[in-house]
Curated annotation (Swiss-Prot):
Pathway: Amino-acid biosynthesis; L-leucine biosynthesis; L-leucine from 3-methyl-2-oxobutanoate: step 2/4. Keywords: Amino-acid biosynthesis, Branched-chain amino acid biosynthesis, Leucine biosynthesis, Lyase. This is 3-isopropylmalate dehydratase small subunit. GO terms for cellular component: 3-isopropylmalate dehydratase complex.
Length: 203
């Protein structure tokens, strides 16, 4: 998993509340077996018109937000089903962090498992970021080492994050990576473990 320490990039405002996972990545695109390739389908029903052409009214299709890496969203982002494809699609599109007043619990947890940083800020702070992000070229910094969201024009807000999750993100550790930190200890245990102890049979 790619570590996250500090991200400075274009910020795009998605001023909608209760965005659910079916809106993030519609169910008809969930048949892939890889984690990559979902970015092209992100917010599909909003990004594209019925004839398949880009919807010029949707924020991600505006040229000023091309290459954005930080998404600013409304409260309860990621509600609905627990599909892990939602953070996959956001990451594959290029987002590294999402800022919102609140997130659905399962989506929030899935983000950390996939190297995507969800940042909870007060509603008034998110509203101010939405306003600032209307300006072309608006860039924002999300600093996980200092737990700060800031820009070059005086905006600065601290955010809270669980210490264990912060450690995992800073060092790019998923569940397998965490286990491999103890590879030597596991090998030493297996070497000294008596052969007569019961084992789980392989199938």
């Amino acid at each position: 998993m790619r570590p996250f320490t500090r991200e400075t990039g274009l910020a795009v405002p998605l001023d909608r509340v209760n965005v659910d996972t079916d809106q993030i990545i519609p169910k008809q695109f969930l048949k892939r077996i890889e984690r990559t390739g979902f970015g092209q389908f992100l917010f599909h029903d909003w990004r594209y018109l019925p004839d398949g052409s880009p919807n010029p009214e949707f924020v991600l299709n505006r040229p000023q937000y091309a290459g954005a890496t930080i998404l600013i969203a409304g409260r309860n982002f990621g509600s609905g089903s627990s599909r892990e494809h939602a953070p996959w699609a956001l990451s594959d599109y290029g987002f590294r962090a999402i800022i919102a007043p609140s997130f659905a619990d399962i989506f929030y947890n899935n983000c950390f498992q996939n190297g995507l940083l969800p940042v909870v800020l007060p509603e008034e702070a998110v509203a101010e970021l939405m306003r600032r992000a209307q300006e072309p070229g608006y860039r924002l910094t999300v600093d996980l080492e200092r737990c700060v969201v800031e820009d070059d024009a005086g905006f600065r807000v601290d955010f809270a994050i669980d210490a264990f999750r912060r450690h995992r993100m800073l060092h790019g550790l998923d569940d397998i990576g965490l286990t491999l930190q103890y590879e030597d200890e596991i090998a030493a245990y297996e070497a000294r473990r008596p052969a007569w102890l019961p084992t789980t049979p392989a199938r």
